[in-house]
Amino acid sequence: DAETTGALLGLDGTEAVLDEAISSGGNRVISHHPLIFKGYKSITGKDYVERCILKAIKNDIVIYSAHTNLDNAPGGVNYKIAEKIGLKNVRILEPKENCLIKLVTFVPTAQAEEVRNALFTAGCGYIGDYDSCSYNTEGEGTFRAQEGSKPFCGNIGELHHEAEVRIETILPEYKKREVIRTLLLTHPYEEPAYDLYPLYNSWAQVGAGIIGELKEAESELEFLKRIKKTFEVGCLKHNKLTGRLIQKVALCGGAGAFLIPQA
């Protein structure tokens, strides 16, 4: 629960990075690659990873790593590489699956717009390059309020008919708690009815790798030279040149061998 006094951003959480954080008075290191990739039963300082762990503990430094989540995120590592290369019409090479759910709820007609907009603000309704996506059907709901309840409409002990709107929208599963909380706070009913459905749809905005097109086709050698210059690297490792022009490019910020079939 300590306050952050300063943060250092780096690709890896190395000893040199930790030393710089200590000397600059910072207590947080933000890295792309995690320091720990396996479990440890003891920490003795026998290698650089254990030395970094000990140094971080002794100096109250928090190490936060955004690795594959940043690789797969919209606007993350792959998007930035594609942007620097100059790719157009980019899309995810391997979109994530089983990450989306559908929310269905039933709201009195007069309050439907307020609830719907609150759900959009909470993170619902994003499909591709569109937001505020929903499907709405008018219908009639029935209920009988029991003793001890505080009905928004109708009387205790009487069957009530209410004009309602069935609102259907989509959301990423990690937003579920926030969205349901928003629904319960915004919905006028004491006991709002809602359903959640798991979806098998691919989430086109999130996933591994990027594929896109160059504005103009380039020779393989021209493309490789431009990549080398753009990313300021000393050398590039590549396969045998084929003599073809390059127009469509697939990329991955990492090894990416698992994406070769998709590419």
Tell what function each PLM region has.
Residues 1-263:
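Hydrophobic structural segments
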